Curated annotation (Swiss-Prot):
Keywords: Transferase
Sequence ranges assigned to domain GST C-terminal in this UniProt record: 93-209
E.C. numbers: 2.5.1.18
Highest classification ranks of the organism: Eukaryota, Sar, Alveolata, Apicomplexa, Aconoidasida
Catalytic activity, as annotated: RX + glutathione = an S-substituted glutathione + a halide anion + H(+)
RNA-binding is among the record's keywords: no
Protein name: Glutathione S-transferase
Residues involved in glutathione binding: Q62, V63, Q75, S76, D109, K121, T125
Keyword DNA repair part of the UniProt annotation: no
Amino acid sequence: MTYLYNFFFFFFFFFSRGKAELIRLIFAYLQVKYTDIRFGVNGDAFAEFNNFKKEKEIPFNQVPILEIGGLILAQSQAIVRYLSKKYNISGNGELNEFYADMIFCGVQDIHYKFNNTNLFKQNETTFLNEELPKWSGYFEKLLQKNNTNYFVGDTITYADLAVFNLYDDIESKYPNCLKNFPLLKAHIELISNIPNIKHYIANRKESVY
């Protein structure tokens, strides 16, 4: 299989959002050009991926992966942290970096619960009535405490993009889930109206997940 490489970053995932979407949002926000390679656009995704694995040595044999000058970086969360640090959206100072990472880790916890509900149909009632309002309350309080429209400091970090990506997913299934969380709802709207993010969302190809 031959790919046309146009930019310095080459990002590989399936034709879906999943664990790749936050990374794509980071690229969009930063206006960093990259080659977005998606298995399954023109055929069998898993056949394409299996052929790809024969050509390249991939840590853990899974995607997403980010290739930079022949160096392959794996694990979505590690890629998020790498890009955020590289492009200075990881928080100003050691403590803010910690808080951004703390919120990012929290997002992973609730996103995992949502995926179990959305993809595997597990405990939807419990998620909708207990887990989702509980975690939304956590994020609401963090915004209230920071009191700057952002989760960390007074400017955007990858924590803001991670929370946005989470609720971009959740609101597609539960559109009224933030009605009792005004600060969180306003924050999601704030991020969604950043010009680069707005343009990316408007032009994003639809996918099953």
